[in-house]
A protein has these predicted regions:
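Acetyl-CoA-dependent GNAT
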Residues: 3-75, 79, 84, 97-98, ...
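Short hydrophobic/aromatic beta-strand or adjacent loop that forms the aromatic wall/cage
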Residues: 51, 147-151
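Conserved acetyl-CoA-binding loop-helix of GNAT-fold acetyltransferases
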Residues: 83, 89-102, 127-131
């Protein structure tokens, strides 16, 4: 994107900026979704063996964070996608989502899924997912469909 020199990095969650962006993500989930329907992971949850986290940086500033949870040899789940407010609409989230999709293909996955909320604040993310080919579909894994969540899938 013009004016930005984004770099994607594998993220071990040790950076204070990454921690702050994850905290902002969790705060947003709590504000827009009843707590019993929030499935966002905190830093300890994102450290699971089957989860990889990446972040997008513009110089020394974090622009976005996102994760890939391996559900099986062929299916993955997008987790904790969040752009920093200063970088919303600047392409960092799209760059990261495309990176996760490419990594999933490289890993031999054939399907990516995600669970997200229904509040209007989720609309920018939903637009991004749709533009990248994700389609609405059924609940997956241990999720249950309800009035506060929705599910999207991408066949790779």
């Amino acid at each position: 994107m013009a004016g930005h020199d984004f770099v994607i990095k594998a993220d071990d969650l040790s950076s204070p900026q990454t921690g702050a962006l994850i905290a902002l993500h969790l705060q947003g989930m709590a504000q827009n979704t009843p707590q019993e329907h929030v499935y966002a992971l905190d830093k300890s949850g994102l450290r699971a063996d089957n989860i990889r986290v990446w972040s997008v940086w513009d110089g020394d500033r974090i622009a976005a964070v996102g994760a890939l949870k391996q559900l099986s040899d062929t299916q993955g789940e997008i987790k904790s996608m969040r752009a920093h407010p200063d970088f919303c609409g600047k392409g960092a989230g799209k760059l990261l989502l495309l990176h996760i999709i490419a990594q999933s293909k490289q890993d031999g996955m054939t399907r990516l899924s995600l669970e997200t909320g229904c509040h209007p604040d989720f609309e920018p993310a939903l637009t991004l997912y749709r533009r990248c080919g994700f389609l609405p579909g059924a609940a997956f894994g241990d999720y249950h469909a309800g009035e506060h969540n929705q599910f999207f899938h991408l066949n790779l």
